[in-house]
Design a protein with these regions (language model features):
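Surface/interface-facing alpha-helical segments and adjacent flexible terminal/loop regions used
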Residues: 1-15, 19-118
């Protein structure tokens, strides 16, 4: 798999992670299903980001943060269909949450997962 393919795949896992973190922040609750999705997205994201032979990671911390920023709006749009069974638009949902807090939470979870699976 090429580096670009890996980055695209990592971005997909970031979007899934953010989608569920946005729902948690907006609804102020979680479900076992959301927790499993978060866990699986983190596990697959970290596995895909890890370089096998050379060691290290494809994306640096700065790249991870930039990637989370980049996919946030798509995750917010998709979360608007799921949070409260789609009662709110993405714009309304964005007013219920703090974008920086959600992105920082996602980054912290990625960091923690990288450290515990190293």
């Amino acid at each position: 798999m090429s580096r670009d393919d890996k980055i695209t795949r990592i971005a997909s896992f970031m979007e899934i992670l953010l989608l569920h973190l946005i729902k948690q922040a907006a609804e102020q609750r979680t479900t076992p299903s959301w927790e499993r999705s978060i866990h699986n997205a983190l596990r697959h994201l970290v596995r895909t980001n890890k370089r096998r032979k050379a060691g290290g990671y494809y994306l640096t911390d700065a790249d991870l943060l930039a990637g989370l920023e980049e996919v946030f709006d798509d995750a917010l749009y998709n979360a608007s269909f799921e949070a409260w069974v789609g009662q709110y638009t993405a714009e309304a949902l964005s007013r219920m949450i703090d974008r920086r807090v959600v992105i920082q939470r996602a980054f912290d979870l990625i960091q923690h997962t990288q450290q515990t699976t190293a």
